[in-house]
């Protein structure tokens, strides 16, 4: 049966799955000569496991049956693409990543360009303090040589040969120099800290500025928790790199240069010997620096994920508690913590290997210099003082090199965090809020011409296709339709959060795709179903976004118009009452009325009401509808309402009905459409009306009621049986049911209910809206 070919084995997958592209990337699998003693013998291969990164799980070859005693020839699955191409791409990616690292570092330091005077002053003070500090080994060497040549002399009679000064005067001058070095060190620390704080503040301001001017597509793809993490933890890492480590790095660089110069002047032979240890140090810094940078970026991303989870849990804490899901959310948070722990552990091992390598090289160099320096002293080629000074310079220079390695490590971490911040600043929004012509408001004529639209995050799901309608100036129009058919999307398109895929949207005969977004939005007021208030006072929220400062009378007038003046005046601080984050100290209806006042005080040309009265009680809704009715009569603005409730639809003059495909199926006066029982509006409102119980629901209730009566009767019989010990056996046989009988009855009840539900589903008809001529 084999006939020179290996048949399809039992791989635990279907034959048609092998044709999928992701399975086509399996590595080449060869089966060597498998000899079977008989044609029907079953060869178990249950232990043979093939693992492919393309699939992500093992494919178990369970068994196959051979019908021939012939040797099975070599057979292989299609091999993957050539390795050379992948290697080339990998090498190119590594080179590109390395280039990006250096670009991020350069960009980070370019932020300090405008403070170059401050930077130069700090470097000058740092040079002074480092130079004085690096003179200590030389001074120690001079003092030791002086003491050796003047053994037995009085201390005050000792003179330094180089300067011809008494030793005590020399030490006094050196003490003054050390004090100057300390003052310079204090000054450089303050200046560099101020400089770094300015750089980080500038970076944060730039990031938040770019973020606030991004388009809606950006916020669809980025969660709030991740953005908060970038502004918080990532900026902190950059701040630490720019404050502590930059200062230490510059100090280490100066100390290293001065130390190498002093060592070369003391003993060129020992200096040449130390050069052999330089390449290994540079090599380790190059190898481990890249790893540290990558782990730092991974750590920041894991921290961002943790922040996202915490932000989602805390913002929805009432939902979590109402569903008693604290345990599930705790598990989610623990998973994010474990991810951070794993990345942190990897970073710890990488840093440990790097610092251990540099420390080992430093210790080896120190011992080598000590051994060879001792030989030079014995050969009278080097004095004891110079050897001591050289050894101290070796230690100082080693610490400087170690400081540079730490500086490089921290800079790589800062580059990893900075790259995430630069991703935000470098992104150009598809809809710039500051580009375009200034909107010239007229009367608020709105027209959609052959508009088709899909959200950028879901391009395959079309919301509109060739949508056409026109809204007259000063009119009141309500947009209704089935849920999820794009009613709120129309509001987003009018505010130009998105551009239509095809077609044009005009306001006052001006194509909004060519208008400045800020200029357009200043003339459009919007009240959403779930209003968002800012932390601050009630006055701040009513006047939010205004380009001028309104008078107290204007604020009070619009508050009365929206029927929120009464409850505001009941607060101790009235309009200056702080309402907390997102208005948490107010009720839902109070927040909604303040949001309406916020929209009306700007006197917009177009007012968009997206379920604006959904959070109000009947009395408040009636009052607000009265206000909107007065606005409609004044014809001062075009009002576009999005609603499901009849009370909201009724107040509008005209109605636009959207169908299931997102197209307009009906337009007209509300009274005319509502009076016509065959109109799309009537059909939609009748479907949304709360119907009485169906026949199936009544039957289900009867079945459940019957079961409850049976259970009650069983309970009474059981109680009677327990009280009557003499007739116990007889009652058990006649009244009590066996467990099997009870289970059968429960199954019958469940099947009856399930059958009735199926019948109800069959009889249920979806909403069908037919276009009216």
Curated annotation (Swiss-Prot):
Present with 3390 molecules/cell in log phase SD medium. Keywords: ATP-binding, Membrane, Mitochondrion, Mitochondrion inner membrane, Nucleotide-binding, Transit peptide, Transmembrane, Transmembrane helix, Transport. Belongs to the ABC transporter superfamily. ABCB family. Mitochondrial peptide exporter (TC 3.A.1.212) subfamily. ATP binds at residues 481-488. Residues 1-90 form a transit peptide. It comes from Saccharomyces cerevisiae (strain ATCC 204508 / S288c) (Baker's yeast). SUPFAM superfamilies: ABC transporter transmembrane region (SSF90123), P-loop containing nucleoside triphosphate hydrolases (SSF52540). One of its GO terms (biological process) is oligopeptide export from mitochondrion. Residues 73-95, 706-773 are annotated as: Disordered. Residues 706-733, 740-762 have a biased composition (Basic and acidic residues). The chain crosses the membrane at residues 123-143, 170-192, 257-277. It comes from the Eukaryota. The gene is MDL2. One of its GO terms (molecular function) is ATP binding. It is found in: Mitochondrion inner membrane. Residues 119-413 form the ABC transmembrane type-1 domain. One of its GO terms (cellular component) is mitochondrion. It holds the Pfam family ABC_membrane. This is ATP-dependent permease MDL2, mitochondrial. It is a multi-pass membrane protein.
């Amino acid at each position: 049966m084999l006939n020179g070919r290996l048949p399809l084995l039992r791989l635990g997958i279907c034959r048609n799955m092998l044709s999928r592209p992701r399975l086509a990337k399996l590595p080449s699998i060869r089966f060597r000569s498998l000899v079977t003693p008989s044609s029907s013998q079953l060869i178990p291969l249950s232990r043979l496991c093939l693992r492919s990164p393309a699939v992500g799980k093992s494919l178990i070859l369970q068994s196959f049956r051979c019908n021939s005693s012939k040797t099975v020839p070599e057979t292989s699955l299609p091999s993957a693409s050539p390795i050379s191409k992948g290697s080339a791409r990998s090498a190119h990616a590594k080179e590109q990543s390395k280039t990006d690292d250096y670009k991020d570092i350069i960009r980070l330091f370019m932020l300090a360009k405008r403070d170059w005077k401050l930077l130069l002053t700090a470097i000058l003070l740092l040079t002074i303090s480092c130079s004085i500090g690096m003179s200590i080994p030389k001074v120690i060497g001079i003092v030791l040589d002086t003491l050796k040549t003047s053994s037995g002399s009085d201390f005050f009679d000792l003179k330094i040969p180089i300067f011809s000064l008494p030793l005590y005067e020399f030490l006094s001058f050196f003490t003054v120099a050390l004090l100057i070095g300390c003052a310079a060190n204090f000054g450089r620390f303050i200046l560099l800290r101020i400089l770094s704080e300015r750089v980080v503040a500038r970076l944060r301001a730039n990031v938040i500025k770019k973020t606030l001017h991004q388009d809606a597509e950006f916020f669809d793809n980025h969660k709030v928790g991740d953005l908060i993490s970038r502004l918080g933890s990532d900026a902190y890492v950059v701040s630490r790199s720019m404050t502590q480590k930059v200062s230490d790095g510059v100090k280490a660089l100066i100390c290293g240069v001065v130390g190498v110069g002093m060592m070369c002047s003391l003993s060129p032979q020992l200096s040449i010997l130390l050069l052999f240890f330089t390449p290994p140090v540079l090599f380790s810094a190059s190898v481990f620096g890249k790893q540290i940078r990558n782990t730092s970026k991974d750590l920041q991303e894991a921290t961002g994920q943790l922040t996202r989870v915490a932000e989602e849990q805390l913002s929805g804490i009432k939902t979590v508690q109402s569903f008693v899901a604290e345990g599930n959310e705790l598990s989610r948070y623990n998973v994010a913590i474990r991810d951070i722990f794993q990345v942190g552990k990897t970073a710890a091992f990488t840093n440990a290997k790097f610092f251990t390598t540099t420390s080992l090289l430093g210790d080896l160099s120190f011992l080598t210099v000590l051994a060879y320096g001792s030989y030079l002293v014995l050969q009278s080629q080097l004095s004891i003082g110079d050897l001591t000074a050289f050894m101290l310079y070796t230690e100082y220079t080693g610490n400087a090199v170690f400081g540079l390695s730490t500086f490089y490590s921290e800079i790589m971490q800062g580059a990893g965090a900075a790259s995430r911040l630069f991703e935000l600043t470098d992104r150009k929004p598809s809809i710039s809020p500051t580009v375009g012509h200034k909107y010239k408001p007229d009367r608020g004529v709105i027209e959609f011409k052959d508009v088709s639209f899909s959200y950028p995050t879901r391009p395959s799901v079309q919301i509109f296709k060739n949508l056409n309608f026109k809204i007259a100036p000063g009119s009141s129009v309500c947009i209704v339709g089935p849920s999820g058919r794009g009613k709120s999307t129309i509001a987003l398109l009018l505010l130009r959060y998105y551009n239509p895929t095809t077609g044009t949207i005009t306001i006052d005969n001006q194509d909004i795709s060519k208008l400045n977004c800020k200029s357009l939005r200043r003339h459009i007021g919007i009240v959403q179903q779930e209003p968002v208030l800012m932390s601050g006072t009630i006055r701040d929220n009513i006047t939010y976004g205004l380009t001028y400062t309104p008078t107290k009378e204007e604020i009070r007038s619009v508050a009365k118009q929206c029927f929120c003046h009464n409850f505001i005046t009941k607060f101790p601080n009235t309009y200056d009452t702080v309402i907390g984050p997102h208005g948490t100290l107010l009720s839902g209806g109070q927040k909604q009325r303040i949001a309406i006042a916020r929209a009306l005080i700007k006197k917009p040309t177009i007012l968009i009401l997206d379920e604006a009265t959904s959070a109000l009680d009947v009395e408040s809704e009636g009052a607000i509808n009265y206000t909107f009715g007065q606005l409609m009569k004044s014809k001062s603005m075009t009002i576009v309402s999005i609603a499901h409730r009849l009370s909201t639809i009724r107040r509008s003059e005209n109605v636009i009905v959207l169908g299931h495909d997102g197209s307009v199926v009906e337009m007209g006066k509300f009274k005319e459409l509502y009076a016509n029982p065959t109109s799309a509006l009537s059909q939609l409102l009748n479907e949304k009306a709360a119907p009485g119980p169906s026949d199936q629901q009544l039957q289900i209730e009867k079945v459940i009621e019957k079961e409850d009566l049976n259970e009650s009767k069983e309970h009474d019989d059981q109680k009677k049986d327990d009280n009557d010990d003499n007739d116990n056996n007889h009652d058990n046989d006649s009244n009590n049911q066996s467990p099997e009988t009870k289970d059968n009855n429960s199954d019958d009840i469940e099947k009856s209910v399930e059958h009735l539900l199926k019948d109800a589903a069959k009889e249920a008809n979806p909403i069908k809206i037919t276009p009216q001529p």
